Amino acid sequence: MRALLDTSVVVAGTSITVDSAAVSVITIAELGYGIGHQPDPFERSRRSLCLSRIQELYEPLPVDVIVADAWAQLAAYTAACGRQPRRRAFDLLIAATAQAHGLTLLTRDEDLLWLSDVLDVRAV
């Protein structure tokens, strides 16, 4: 299986066995935000090391026009299902990245599993 690791999987340090794995540039942004807003210097340092390790292990997949188109479709689907796409914009961008690249989205975020009707998303 070729997979995209959701931020929740990266943060948890979940051990995953897949043929190949990737992360989204959105995950890099979310991790950086978490570092910048962490008041505890020890936790900030731990998170910085985690981010450095992720950047060494993976070449983040960018948000490009194909991902943007996939996001627009997922956001419209989300709204049609009565959910708020803007509240989950980063999650939907990560999901769109998986969809655009034909990857399985691996997540620990149960709120993403409802996308399984339109995306290969699996809980880990």
Language model: regions and residue ranges:
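Short, polar loop motifs at secondary-structure junctions
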Residues: 7-14, 108-111
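C-terminal structural segments of small proteins and small subunits
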Residues: 100-106, 110-113
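PIN-domain endoribonuclease scaffold, especially VapC-family toxins
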Residues: 2-3, 13-96, 114-124
